[in-house]
A protein has these predicted regions:
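Cys/His-rich, Zn2+-coordinating zinc-finger modules
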Residues: 3-15, 44-125
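Disordered regulatory linkers adjacent to lipid/PI-binding modules
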Residues: 125-127, 226-278, 288, 296-297, ...
Length: 368
């Protein structure tokens, strides 16, 4: 048997081992590439970033490239578990570890942080001060604003000018969330920050031209949230806190809605369903700064349910596929443009309704 064939078989056996069967960087199954300088098995997507890190990483295809005996022996001695012990030794509990379907900037900066910058050997500070491009509250334009995030008082401040002494806004991290939204923001490093102000959800849309900077901001928010929640929810453990640091919405998209009397004309609105706080928010457009309204979603035992609404000629509705969400106070009728969207929304509502309530949910006035 030729050494090329023999080495390919050895590599294919190595990649079947449990610790190597998923990409070392994003967890994608069945990695087809490997870094012969780091000794890790990675997927095609992550191999692209490794290919840019020529000082620390070199990649080959497991199946298509020729592997010399010494490189195969290096892969045998190392592997994903050995690399993880070295390069992820001190990853902070709050730090977001990107998964297969996360946006490019998160995966790219995670790989660079691990191998090129080797960041995870010291303690992260709970402070961040810098400039971000921020969308105006009632304008489409983005303008530079100075932001300061502090763990000392658990706040995020932003200033109109870099030398301003008085903050335009002081935002508590208590109900803050941050999520990457490159498509919505229109920039590959786009970040959406949400928080509560006067019982309404406020959106901030920001970005930074540098991918490392925006990922640092994202993880700084997670760091300060982590410190806050450890204090507020003591003695909760990390496994309970991690899902609360930052969360993606369960589903977003347009539906049409009518008013409480159900004879008002239907209007198209942008809806956001959040499973952690069990809320359905709606906005006029995806980039609105403030919600138009919100509905808390309890369990079936509290009188909440969702069902398909028969197709009918609804007053002012251009769309045909309806669904009804029943609550103790009123029924909400929504119309979807496509049948697939209707099914997806019903499935998402059912998922939230089926989740057990947590102690913090009982403070909602709808359940008292």
């Amino acid at each position: 048997m030729a050494s090329w064939d023999r080495n390919t078989i050895i590599l294919l056996d190595l990649v079947k081992q449990p610790e190597n069967a998923r990409c070392a960087d994003c967890g994608a199954p069945d990695p087809d590439w490997a870094s012969y300088k780091l000794g890790v098995f990675v997927c095609l997507n992550c191999s692209g970033t490794h290919r840019d890190l020529t000082d620390v990483s070199r990649v080959k295809s497991i199946r298509l490239d020729n592997w010399e005996d010494d490189l195969v022996e290096f892969m045998r001695r190392n592997g994903n578990a050995v690399a993880k012990a070295q390069y992820e030794k001190s990853v902070p509990a709050f730090y977001y570890r990107p998964q297969q379907h996360d946006c490019v900037v998160l995966r790219d900066q995670w790989i660079r942080a691990k191998y090129a910058r080797q960041e995870f050997t010291g303690k992260n500070a709970g402070f961040c001060d810098g400039t971000l491009w921020k969308k105006g509250k009632n304008k489409r334009q983005f303008q530079k604003r100075r932001f300061v995030l502090s763990q000392d008082d658990f706040t995020l401040r932003y200033f109109i000018k870099e030398d301003s002494k008085v903050a335009k806004a002081i935002i508590s991290v208590r109900n803050m969330n941050a999520v990457f939204q490159p498509e919505k923001v229109g920039h590959q490093n786009g970040l959406q920050i949400t928080y509560m102000t006067e019982d309404r959800t406020r959106n901030l849309f920001v970005y930074h031209e540098n991918g490392q900077e925006i990922v640092n901001w994202f993880n700084a928010v997670r760091a300060v949230r982590y410190a806050y929640l450890r204090k507020a929810l003591a003695p909760a453990n990390d496994s309970e806190l991690m899902p609360l640091l930052t969360t993606r919405s369960l589903k977003e998209g347009y539906m049409e809605k009518t008013g409480p009397m159900q004879w008002e004309p239907f209007k198209r609105r942008w809806f956001v369903l959040c499973s952690v706080d069990r809320k359905l928010l709606y906005f006029k457009t995806p980039m609105d700064a403030l919600e138009l309204g919100a509905v808390f979603i309890g369990t079936e035992a509290h009188g909440f349910s969702v069902r398909e609404t028969p197709t009918r000629g609804s007053r002012g509705s251009r769309w045909r596929y309806g669904l009804t969400m029943e609550t103790p106070d009123r029924n909400f009728i929504f119309m979807c443009e496509q049948e697939l969207e209707q099914r997806d929304w019903i499935k998402a509502f059912q998922q939230v309704i089926a989740q057990p309530l947590l102690p913090q949910h009982y403070s909602n006035k709808k359940l008292i």
